[in-house]
Each structure stands twice: as C-alpha cells, then as structure tokens.
C-alpha cells in the first residue's frame, strides 16, 4: 500500500516497476496472498493486470481511486487521467474477470447536476464490485477551498446518499451472484458460533466479511474453503467445506448476472 502504488520505480523512468515488484514478492516462499492497494488508474495497464492474473498467489483484486468520471471535474481536481482512459481500465478489468474497487467523490466545487448524473450512469454501467464514496470537504490553504461554485452541504449529502443507495443495490446483486460458489477464506476471528474471514475479493478494513459455520474448530490465521450460501449487500454467509490449498476461483465465474441490477 502507498499513496500511489503504481508509482513504484518511476523515479528511474516513466514506466512503473510495480509488475516486477509483484513478481519478486510473489516468488517468496510462504507468501499466500499478495494484494495491491491504492493504485491510481493513470499507470494501470495490461502489463500490470496480466502479471497479477498469471500469479496464483496474487489477489484478483485492485483498488483504484477514480474520484470522478466527468472530464472537467477530473481536470479541476488536477488529475492527469482522462475519462476515456478510466473507462478503458474498467474494460480491461472486466475482460479479465478481476475484482475492482474504487472510491468516488461528490460535491467537488463546480460539480453540476449533469456531472453527478454522469457519475451515477457510470456506476450503473460499470457495476463496481466494491465502491466507497465521500463528500468533498474544503481544507484551509488548498486551491480547491478557494475555487468558485462551492457546493452547499445539503446538496453534497443528497448526492452522496443517492450514490450510496445505488451502490447498495449493485453490491447486493454482485454478492448474490456468488451464492453457490466456493472460495478460499482466511479465518480472522470467531464471533459467537460462527467464524469471520475474508477471501481474496475482500480487502481488510474496507470491504465486507464472510461469516461461516464449521462442524470442526478452525484455527485463526488458517485458510479454509467456504461455500457461499447467502448474501447481504456487503457481507456473505457460508459453510466450511473440505480444505484444499488450490481453491482459487476466478471472479469472472462469480459475477455473471449483470442484468439483476438494471
């Protein structure tokens, strides 16, 4: 994790060295899971995604804080990426069946209702597997705090609520599509009679959890196979099945019912 993981190695040139770093870490004996967090989409390319997809102990999951999709909002934010490239990155993810998480902002100065509608349409179109959002909050001394067309707090809140309501439905449909599948779960704790863990598709502290029952004790920190039996918007429920070390499932097989949230 870093402020921008994809910038690794760019001090020696323009090309990110993150793919090479991932390969080297993945080759270390005992590394069960390797997850890249907070990668800005500007430097995400097919080379990085193909490297991640090829290595069995690298999670099919990437966290890309996109912030917005309106080109003029991205420009006002001083983001060097373009709306067109962000859409292309999303296409590359879906093509490879990889899990995509993003963070979006509402209420940046100058955000019109048309800009927000474009953002909502983008979320409907892409159907992010994981998404967080926050409202713009001006900080003293920053350029954005001095920009004209500041958005009223009540408008920010209303847009935030609409966006998160939309994503709630998206997330529920995505999770329901996982019912009946089996995934490898890292056991993190026990809560009452059930265990709590996460698969490669849930990042720690930011995503939901998998709650599962087991007829036999599970060691905290171990990996078990869990069959998903029920879904909520952000959490999954299941039951432990027999242990297999090679129980990695492809996300492209988990999220096929895309019409459910239209």
Regions flagged by a language model, labelled:
Residues 36, 64, 103, 123, ...:
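Conserved, mostly hydrophobic/aromatic
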Residues 1-114:
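Conserved SAM/AdoMet-binding glycine-rich loop
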Residues 2-4, 65-68, 135-140, 199-201:
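Short, small-residue-rich loop/turn micro-motifs
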Residues 111, 123-128:
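Contiguous mid-protein beta-loop-alpha structural module that forms a pocket-lining wall or clamp
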Residues 135, 146-262:
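Terminal RNA-binding accessory module
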Residues 60, 100, 139-145, 238:
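Conserved loop-to-beta-strand segment in the C-terminal subdomain of adenylate-forming
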Residues 8-30, 76, 138-169:
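Radical SAM enzyme [4Fe-4S]-AdoMet core and its adjacent flexible, acidic
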């Amino acid at each position: 994790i870093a402020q921008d993981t994809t910038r690794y190695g760019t001090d020696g040139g323009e090309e990110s060295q993150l793919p090479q770093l991932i390969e080297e870490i993945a080759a270390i004996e005992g590394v069960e899971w390797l997850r890249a967090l907070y990668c800005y989409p500007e430097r995400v390319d097919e080379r990085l995604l193909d490297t991640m997809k090829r290595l069995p102990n690298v999670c099919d999951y990437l966290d890309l804080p996109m912030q917005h999709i309106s080109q003029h909002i991205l420009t006002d934010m001083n983001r060097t990426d373009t709306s067109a490239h962000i859409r292309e990155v999303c296409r590359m993810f879906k093509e490879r069946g990889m899990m995509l998480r993003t963070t979006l902002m509402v209420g940046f100065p100058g955000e019109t209702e048309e800009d927000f509608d474009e953002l909502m349409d983008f979320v409907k179109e892409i159907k992010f597997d994981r998404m967080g959002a926050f409202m713009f909050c001006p900080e003293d001394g920053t350029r954005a705090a001095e920009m004209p067309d500041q958005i009223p707090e009540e408008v920010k809140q209303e847009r935030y609520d609409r966006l998160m309501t939309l994503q709630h439905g998206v997330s529920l449909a995505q999770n329901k599509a996982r019912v009946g599948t089996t995934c490898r779960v890292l056991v993190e704790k026990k809560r009452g009679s059930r265990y709590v863990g996460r698969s490669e598709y849930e990042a720690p502290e930011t995503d939901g959890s998998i709650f599962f029952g087991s007829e036999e004790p599970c060691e905290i920190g171990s990996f078990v196979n869990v069959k998903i039996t029920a879904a909520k918007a952000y959490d999954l429920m299941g039951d432990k099945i027999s242990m297999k070390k090679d129980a990695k499932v492809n996300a492209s097989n988990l999220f096929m019912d895309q019409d459910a949230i239209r």
